[in-house]
Amino acid sequence: MIQFDDIWVRLHKSVEMISEPNCPDFYFFGGSLRDIYMGIDPKDYDITTVSISDLSWLISRLQGMGFRVIAETDFGLKMNFLSTWMDVGVGCESPVDKISKVDFTCNAIAIDNNFKLYYHKTSFDDLDNRRLRQLDTLEHQGSIEERKIKFTQKNFKFHNKQDEKKLYKFKLETKQLKPSVPFYMDARTYDEKSN
């Protein structure tokens, strides 16, 4: 298992490398910070700004550091440099606004370039207990059941027993459909050795 301190040092260095004097504010948020807290090496880093002009600065800054745009998504850009993935998202009013729109409290974490931490009141307690508590947002409603399955595979438990019952039913329905669902390899999991 990777040490929390090692990952934190890498994140700290990343923030320092991206920052420059009088630069616009930017922040990391979501799953990468969750993984760092849990001592897991993040598969990617979610990063954004509070305005479109600041986002343009951030993209330009990352490109100047060697990151290249690999794909454009509904949520922003996927950038890569030396096997480090960045999901550069569209701006929000504030880090608090951004994390209030995530799916679960364990993902409701953000840290800005001044190292100020923003989080839901139960984020760290839920992470320590591997408890999955859904936030009441509409942004992820279409994929919430699939995301719950992803977290149960990481040994998270639901805060609400009723949710566990619903998920079991969803797993059964999904299992029946599985043979007809095509497999798509995620670019982040691509391994040249597998060819």
What name fits each language-model region?
Residues 1-195:
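Catalytic cores of the polymerase beta-like nucleotidyltransferase superfamily
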